[in-house]
Amino acid sequence: MKLRGLYAITDSQLLAGRFLTHVEAALEGGVRLLQYRDKSDDAARRLREAQALQKLCERYGTELVINDDAELAARLGVGVHLGQTDGPLTPARALLGRQAIIGSTCHASLDLAAQAASEGASYVAFGRFFNSVTKPGAPAADVGLLAQARGQVKLPIAVIGGITLDNAAPLVAHGADLLAVIHGLFGADSAQEVTRRARAFNALFAS
C-alpha cells in the first residue's frame, strides 16, 4: 500500500455545519489518507461521524484513520494515528492487526521516528513546519529534518503544521510523502474550493 499524496485531517469546530459536505468535497479532489480528529468526549457522536466518514472513504477509495482512539479504530476496522502522549504503538498494532495503518507523531525527532518504526508504525509524522492554528506550541521542524529522515527511516513521511498551497511544494521536494492539512484545506469558503485545493495539493506530487 503506497502512502503518498494529500493527508486530510478533520477539525470538528472548523467544519461545524458542513462536516460531511466539505469532507466529501476533499475526497472528490483526491485524498490518500483521511484522519478523523475529534477531541470531544461525546462518544456516540464520534462513532456516528466516524461511521459516516468510513462510508465516504470506501466510496472514494481513501484510507481512514482515527486520531488517538485505537478502540474506535478497531470497532470500525480502520487505522489509527497516535501522538506521543498516547503510549507505545505496540498495543495498538496487536489490537488492530498487521495490515492496519498506524501513524505516529514524532515532532522534530529522528529518535522518536526510529522508535515508532521499531514498534510497527506504518508512517511517521514530523512537524510543525509552519505556524499552526491547531497546535501553536508544537516543536518546530524544518526541511533539513526531511533529508535526514529519508536516509534513516524506511517509512512514508507525513509533514504537518500550517501547511498551505503556498508553502507545501518545498516539503514535497525534500521528501515528504504525505501532506497533512487541516485549515489549508478545510478553511475554504465553499465545497468547490475544498475540491480545488485538494487537487492542487495532489498536483504537487505529480511534478
From Swiss-Prot:
Gene Ontology molecular-function annotations: magnesium ion binding; thiamine-phosphate diphosphorylase activity
**One biological-process term from Gene Ontology?**
thiamine diphosphate biosynthetic process
List ligand-binding residues for 4-amino-2-methyl-5-(diphosphooxymethyl)pyrimidine.
Answer: Q35, Y36, R37, D38, K39, N67, T105, K135
Tell me which UniProt keywords the record has, alphabetically.
Answer: Magnesium, Metal-binding, Thiamine biosynthesis, Transferase
Cofactor: how and how many bound: Binds 1 Mg(2+) ion per subunit.
Catalysed conversion reaction: 2-[(2R,5Z)-2-carboxy-4-methylthiazol-5(2H)-ylidene]ethyl phosphate + 4-amino-2-methyl-5-(diphosphooxymethyl)pyrimidine + 2 H(+) = thiamine phosphate + CO2 + diphosphate; 2-(2-carboxy-4-methylthiazol-5-yl)ethyl phosphate + 4-amino-2-methyl-5-(diphosphooxymethyl)pyrimidine + 2 H(+) = thiamine phosphate + CO2 + diphosphate; 4-methyl-5-(2-phosphooxyethyl)-thiazole + 4-amino-2-methyl-5-(diphosphooxymethyl)pyrimidine + H(+) = thiamine phosphate + diphosphate
* Binding-site list for Mg(2+): D68, D86
- Tell me which InterPro entries the record gives: Aldolase_TIM (IPR013785), ThiamineP_synth_sf (IPR036206), ThiamineP_synth_TenI (IPR022998), TMP_synthase (IPR034291)
Enzyme nomenclature, EC number? 2.5.1.3
Query: Record's family?
Result: Belongs to the thiamine-phosphate synthase family.
PANTHER family membership: THIAMINE-PHOSPHATE PYROPHOSPHORYLASE (PTHR20857), THIAMINE-PHOSPHATE SYNTHASE (PTHR20857:SF15)
Instruction: Outline what the protein does.
Output: Condenses 4-methyl-5-(beta-hydroxyethyl)thiazole monophosphate (THZ-P) and 2-methyl-4-amino-5-hydroxymethyl pyrimidine pyrophosphate (HMP-PP) to form thiamine monophosphate (TMP).
What is this protein identified as? Answer: Thiamine-phosphate synthase
What organism is listed for this UniProt entry?
A: Pseudomonas putida (strain W619)
